[in-house]
Amino acid sequence: MTQAYDGFVHLGFSNRNGRTISHKKYQEGNSRVSADNSDANGVPYYFLINMGGGFVEGEQYQVTIDVNKDAHALVTTQTPTYVYKCEKGQLTHQNTSITLEENSYLEYMADEVIPYLRSRYFQTSRIDMDKSAHLIYSDGVTAGWSHEDLPFQYHYFRNLTQIYQDDELVYSDQTLLEPQKQDMFKLGYFEGWRNYNSLVMVSPNIDEAFVKALQKHLENLNLESDFAISSLDIPGLVLRILGKTAEDNRRVIYSCADYFRQEIHGLTPLNLRKNDMRR
């Protein structure tokens, strides 16, 4: 067992004769990975699994993903990330490290975090990618869970995502929520909604015309959630979503990802075998 972590996963993907294979699959502690062969395009597809059903106060987790030159992989979580209540005020932490080599492509579609009563959680993600690589990265957080079904009963949630290209920081996004100190329903926070998600896409094929076409495509779908798309300073975009349910938000996320897959890579729509997204 790696001493520093309660759960550890390391996945590596390589291109062999025009086909992506998993050359590394390592798991320790409470963390597991499970392969799925349902992707119609033959892309390696893995679920991240927590054997305890969620994170316990003070636990530390690490996810490492390496995608080598010309390889393409899809990684998602089996369920939302449940962060159980904290009785001693200890911080629970998960770190994700991703490396994308030349012309590689990773779709990392994490479900939302559901923080429990009084929980304290810090999530960090660092993506190091070649300028020719393609990335879809999503995550999110909800109003949480408590026995009384009251929203925002957790104490601390922080999510820091950073993307580097050739060792230069090109994207940094931080969400800091302290519901005991902030009015979570006011403008700039959840604004009456209960679920927040974001999706970042980085690709040399994304330009302003693509962003405008995607915006129009999503507007024509009559989706339930509120969302906004912004271009990045590099070829890419960020999509932010507020919705009534996690399922509503995922429909926006997958619609966006499907558009990119089809228009840029000629791939079929995602089929992540989630109960709310079966096709």
UniProtKB/Swiss-Prot annotation:
<dbReference type="GO" id="GO:0005737">
    <property type="term" value="C:cytoplasm"/>
</dbReference>
<comment type="subunit">
    <text>UreD, UreF and UreG form a complex that acts as a GTP-hydrolysis-dependent molecular chaperone, activating the urease apoprotein by helping to assemble the nickel containing metallocenter of UreC. The UreE protein probably delivers the nickel.</text>
</comment>
<keyword id="KW-0963">Cytoplasm</keyword>
<keyword id="KW-0143">Chaperone</keyword>
<comment type="function">
    <text>Required for maturation of urease via the functional incorporation of the urease nickel metallocenter.</text>
</comment>
<dbReference type="InterPro" id="IPR002669">
    <property type="entry name" value="UreD"/>
</dbReference>
<keyword id="KW-0996">Nickel insertion</keyword>
<dbReference type="Pfam" id="PF01774">
    <property type="entry name" value="UreD"/>
</dbReference>
<dbReference type="GO" id="GO:0016151">
    <property type="term" value="F:nickel cation binding"/>
</dbReference>
<comment type="similarity">
    <text>Belongs to the UreD family.</text>
</comment>
<protein>
    <recommendedName>
        <fullName>Urease accessory protein UreD</fullName>
    </recommendedName>
</protein>
